[in-house]
Amino acid sequence: MESETQNELRNLLRQISVEMSNTPLTSSSRLIIVMSLAIGRRMKLSDLMKVTGCGKGSIENHVLKLEEGGFIKTEKVSFFKSPRVYAELTDKGRNFYEKYLELIGKFMRDAEKSK
């Protein structure tokens, strides 16, 4: 028989899955980008490449998907004739990140209780 805690954990995992499946955050690289921006506030795409391990084309694709989904915004800045692209979270991106942390935190607490 399944315990109430196990049932709650299963429901939390389902909720996390649903939250992520309705967004461009089905990619672990995109989730890492959102988490990095939540911590770093505003980052150059070159720095996001280092964090994720993605190449230039890949990071540009991930950033485009997140921007189209309304999770981040980008800004091109000229720097000695060399454009730099910065990314930062939108309110929607920050809200998603906070809800994701809340769900993961609850999952971890409940999992610890079930031991």
Protein language model regions, located:
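Amphipathic alpha-helical dimerization/coiled-coil segments
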Residues: 2-17, 24, 35, 91-115
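N-terminal helix-turn-helix DNA-binding core of bacterial DNA-binding proteins
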Residues: 14-58, 79, 86
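Aromatic side chains
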Residues: 45, 71, 86, 97-100
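Beta-hairpin "wing" of winged helix-turn-helix
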Residues: 69-83, 88
